[in-house]
A protein has these predicted regions:
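Feature captures the catalytic ectodomains and active-site-proximal regions of enzymes
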Residues: 1-111
């Protein structure tokens, strides 16, 4: 939400805090021998200023990351295929061995 303020130093601090938090979570998942997915639903901090120099506080259409960290030894990996937000839940369900409901329109991005 900090990106919506248009305050660049606050957005930088927020990104750094999230980065540190993700590192802690991934370390815990590694110790547990688990699997973690990291993603976002939209961009915002990637464009903090509009063309005229005013604060840009809206979402952007920039691609967002979708990363898989498999510490389970199962050899899970993403296919590298371009995906969409609707593909995230099917990918996670497939990784957990759960059938993807037919109502879901996305596909698994596992290789």
């Amino acid at each position: 939400m900090v990106g919506h303020t248009g305050v660049i130093p606050a957005a930088v601090a927020a990104v750094e805090a999230v980065d540190a938090g993700v590192e802690q979570v991934l370390s815990a998942v590694e110790r547990a021998g688990g699997v973690a997915f990291v993603t976002a639903d939209h961009g915002n901090a990637d464009k903090m200023l509009a063309e005229d120099g005013s604060p840009h506080t809206a979402h952007t259409t920039a691609p967002v990351p979708f990363a898989l960290a498999d510490f389970s030894g199962r050899g899970l990996r993403l296919s590298g295929e371009e995906g969409a937000l609707c593909d995230i839940a099917p990918t996670m369900l497939t990784a957990m061995g759960v059938d993807v409901p037919p109502e879901m329109t996305g596909k698994s991005l596992l290789a």
